Amino acid sequence: MSQRVKKLTGLVAATFTPLTAEGEINLSVIAAYVDYLIEKQNVKSVFVNGTTGEGCSLTVDERKHLAAAWCQHGKGKLEQLIVHVGCMSIKDSQELARHAASIGADGISVISPSYFKPINADALRLFIKEVSASAPDLPMYYYHLPGMTGVALEAADVLNGIEREIPSFQGVKYSGTDLRDLGQCVCYSQSRDWSVLYGVDEQLLGALVLGVHGAVGSTYNYLGHIVNQMLSAFNNGNHTQTRDLQFGFMEVITFARTLGFDVSVNKQVMSEVSGLPMGPPRLPLLPCPVSKAQAIAQKIHNFTQGL
């Protein structure tokens, strides 16, 4: 990768995957989805086919169609489109990486395999390297999500020396809660001009203090405009406003968790707040009762109306 890469910063929406009532991907929603993120949330970068998007429950072909639709409708509108290509099979990940390059994605990301797990950081780096080699001109971001993968490796150990093996490596989507490990990632990335994006939405303020460059999350699909205010307040040194916004955000998430806040609930909340038909989740996730999502949406409305 020879050309200079535009650094990935700010808010990145981890997109949901719209499905029809029959459980098929619904590409007709994507164009309006792009406009909603930009016009209503002021969020101009996306992370497609990740956890929020139920990527690991989709077929390779479905993931290709979704990525292509986001590229098609986001062209000239979105600042950056990162495609998650992680799979249990390295061959599938490589195929998705090549496809992402062919459609003009701005970068790719890969999560650790979680059935046959890498036994150490060297093994995981090798996996990332072989996926990246299928799209060597695309920036590569490691997706660290130990809570879902069960891979108990520290991200800082994975990053150590990775630039010597993967010239296109550009950073990490850190979706763990270990702030010490996160801080080490930020420290290591500083001299390399990489991006460290935080992925635990309700703890963003702590990550900002450590120096992360932005955040990737599901709630930025419908609370991005509020979190953008928080980022502005933080960057302007208004720590009281930043903290108050974070506390309000935490209150919403805490309320949602009392009702059970998994991907299926979050997806229905997105439908309620945005008006876009996200549809049901894919099994084994079960549909969310509308009343539960409406209660969370009302909590979000109350929070945002006071700002």
From Swiss-Prot:
It catalyses: aceneuramate = aldehydo-N-acetyl-D-mannosamine + pyruvate. It is found in: Cytoplasm. Gene3D superfamilies: Aldolase class I (3.20.20.70). Keywords: Carbohydrate metabolism, Cytoplasm, Lyase, Schiff base. The keyword Lipoprotein does not apply. Its EC number is 4.1.3.3. GO terms for cellular component: cytoplasm. Aceneuramate binds at T51, T52, S175, G199, D201, E202, S218. Its main location: cytoplasm. GO terms for biological process: N-acetylneuraminate catabolic process. It holds the Pfam family DHDPS. Homotetramer. Catalyzes the cleavage of N-acetylneuraminic acid (sialic acid) to form pyruvate and N-acetylmannosamine via a Schiff base intermediate. It prevents sialic acids from being recycled and returning to the cell surface. Involved in the N-glycolylneuraminic acid (Neu5Gc) degradation pathway. This is N-acetylneuraminate lyase. It comes from Danio rerio. The gene is npl.
